[in-house]
Amino acid sequence: MTKKEQALIEQYAKSLVEVASEHHSLDALQADVLAILETFVTTNLDQSLSSQAVPHAEKIKLLTLLKGNNSVYMNNFLNLILQNEREAYLYQMLQAVLNEIAIVSNQYDVTVTSSLPLTEEQKSRVRAVVAKKFAVTAGRLIEKVDPSLIGGFIISVNNKVIDTSIRRQLQAFKMNLK
């Protein structure tokens, strides 16, 4: 992706988030974006929208189906995307919208990787650690299980990481022995 395309994507995302923020509709916008992104993942819609082989009329039909129960701001955004024929960038724009919402609301997704699934008590402790160490509000808690960690956990928030895994400790110990 070129810098020009990236700037375009970011500008669309910022504009949508600004409008939703002015009207105190960030939560509704975030729900809409997450639902549409889920549709992209389950249907490979991104390939259809970015394909030159799919006629513009078909792309219009596909995006019209996405307009269902969305907020007015999301539907207007989708109309704007269609008018300007930017459907190929929609998936990246929606990802950028989530990033902008996180920045504006200081609420970031938290990814926790552990060797075993977390209990509810552990999840609440993770949220407390995130609030204290990173000075952000925890958004969605995305849990991943990786038995190769052996024990401990890895918390990732806004490109910052806390790694207390036994795997990392063993790697550090191995490096110290060299």
Curated annotation (Swiss-Prot):
Membrane topology: Peripheral membrane protein
Transport recorded as keyword: yes
Main subcellular localisation: membrane
Record's subcellular location: Cell membrane
GO cellular component: plasma membrane; proton-transporting ATP synthase complex
One Pfam family it belongs to: OSCP
Listed NCBIfam families: ATP_synt_delta, PRK05758.2-1
Protein family according to the UniProt entry: Belongs to the ATPase delta chain family.
Assembly description: F-type ATPases have 2 components, F(1) - the catalytic core - and F(0) - the membrane proton channel. F(1) has five subunits: alpha(3), beta(3), gamma(1), delta(1), epsilon(1). F(0) has three main subunits: a(1), b(2) and c(10-14). The alpha and beta chains form an alternating ring which encloses part of the gamma chain. F(1) is attached to F(0) by a central stalk formed by the gamma and epsilon chains, while a peripheral stalk is formed by the delta and b chains.
Name assigned to this protein: ATP synthase subunit delta
Organism in which the protein naturally occurs: Streptococcus pyogenes serotype M1
Taxonomic lineage from the root: Bacteria, Bacillati, Bacillota, Bacilli, Lactobacillales
